[in-house]
Amino acid sequence: MKKLLILPLLAFLLLSGCQIENPTFPFRVKVTNAAGVPIQNVIVEASVDVPGYREEAYFIDTTGFDGLVEFEYEYEAVFKILATRGGNPFTHIGCGFIKLEPNTTVQSKIILLPYDPSDPGC
């Protein structure tokens, strides 16, 4: 009888004790045109709009041949994504949001469209 009680107790302790202490929050942004073709050399900025945390949670990189950039953050967060191409003013722009999940690479697709200075923003 004791063996029957010990086995479920041991299984419970083993299964409940398995937690990842320091999860990572990787994310990937893919930039394409309206036809779905990946675009390289696009500046991608990922930031949070929380006062006091902008510097800590700010990433910037340029897309490669495959139109991808990858980042990793330490905490769960929602990032604002801004993708731009060209000088000042931009020639193309795209934006969106991405919610990070622990230990899962979350992907966001940003569609780059021609920038219209008379209608700024995304």
Q: Can you describe what each PLM-predicted range is?
A:
Residues T63-F65, K99-T105:
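Short proline/glycine- and polar residue-rich coil/turn motifs
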Residues S16-R28, T32-A35, T91-G94, T104-C122:
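Beta-strand-rich domain onsets/edges
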Residues Y73-T91:
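A short, solvent-exposed beta-strand micro-motif common in secreted/extracellular proteins
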Residues L68-Y73, K109:
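Exposed aromatic-hydrophobic patches
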